[in-house]
């Protein structure tokens, strides 16, 4: 592939996820403000059991773990390099667990978490319908699912062409998959913003 533009906002779905590109992406976006903004925009309780799908180097996981200090936070990512980086800086957080995993095959038991987040990752899922089915499998009844995307390109979510290109598309697919109480709100911090979709398992 061609060279990657240095320090330039790109559509990450265009990347080939080899180790070199994963390291580059982790350096550029691993601690992006969207992680903090997402966690700050949802309610996290001390006893929550939370899963981050596509956790990257674990920035959001580590922020969330400080809030659910009596619970557990799982982070999964299909890229081994990302998980290695996440574990390197994990220190001694006993309520954090990182592992290689995909949205289509979540390595957790049925109804084992009460909240799931996906930050700038749902457009990477190879089979989003299967991924949404897995989300419902591991969520408890009435569990919450949050999908966060950066606000770019004049209020678009910048995912590029595809079935989940716009927030309207994502909301439609969540409805088809059987989620309820679907809402969409925008949040901003330091001139950066996110679209945050919230929905609930039946």
Report the location of each language-model feature.
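A short SAM/SAH-binding and catalytic strip from SAM-dependent methyltransferases
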Residues: 115-127
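Class I SAM-dependent methyltransferase SAM/SAH-binding core
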Residues: 51-105
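Core SAM-dependent methyltransferase catalytic element
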Residues: 186-202
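Short glycine-centered segments of the SAM/dcSAM-binding site in methyltransferase folds
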Residues: 49, 143-144
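A short glycine-rich, Lys/Arg-flanked "PGG" loop and its adjoining helix->strand segment in the class I
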Residues: 129-141
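A short acidic, Gly/Pro-enriched loop at the edge of an enzyme's catalytic core
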Residues: 104-115
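Conserved class I S-adenosyl-L-methionine
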Residues: 1-43, 59-63, 89, 146-169
